Curated annotation (Swiss-Prot):
One of its GO terms (cellular component) is plasma membrane. Disulfide bonds: none annotated. A lipid is attached at C16 (N-palmitoyl cysteine). It is found in: Cell membrane. InterPro entries: YedD (IPR025596), YedD-like_sf (IPR038624). NCBIfam families: PRK10397.1. Residues 1-15 form the signal peptide. This is Uncharacterized lipoprotein YedD. A lipid is attached at C16 (S-diacylglycerol cysteine). It is a lipid-anchor. The keyword Isomerase does not apply. It comes from the Bacteria. The keyword Lipoprotein applies. It comes from Escherichia coli (strain K12).
């Protein structure tokens, strides 16, 4: 039992966090600077191809859609939360992605994104099929 507690403490100290139940994650409203539509511009090392596009849609209430497209669209809903004072997107797949502001861009899962007026047509179609629980920006 003592070894298990020590192992758990080491994981927390190492920055490895895990979400056991998505439904238990406390949603945090988005700061004004984050609510809206974000998209990669140009090639990104974190994406599978130079032609791939990464998008993040964030509502004021803190609901999110992580949308990545290349030969197909992968759209995963989630919600913002604070983990150790860091703004983090937790997806329904229980993946954790820290969101950091850098001037007029954000850093998200190894990608640099800039604000755009609307999502791509493919991400908008994904939203039509599975709308977020709160109104879009």
């Amino acid at each position: 039992m003592k070894k298990l507690a020590i192992a758990g403490a080491l994981l927390l100290l190492a920055g490895c966090a895990e979400v056991e139940n998505y439904n238990n994650v406390v949603k945090t409203p988005a700061p004004d600077w984050l609510a809206g539509y974000w998209q990669t511009k140009g090639p990104q090392r974190a994406l599978v191809s130079p032609e791939a596009i990464g998008s993040l849609i964030v509502t004021k209430e803190g609901d999110t859609l992580d949308c990545r497209q290349w030969q197909r669209v992968i759209a995963v809903p989630g919600k913002l939360t604070l983990m150790s004072d860091d703004l983090t997107n937790v997806t329904v797949k229980r993946e954790l992605y820290e969101v950091e502001r850098d001037g007029n861009t954000i850093e998200y899962d190894g990608m640099t994104m800039e604000r755009v007026d609307r999502p791509t047509a493919e991400c908008a179609a994904a939203l039509d099929k599975a709308p977020l629980p709160t109104p879009l920006p």
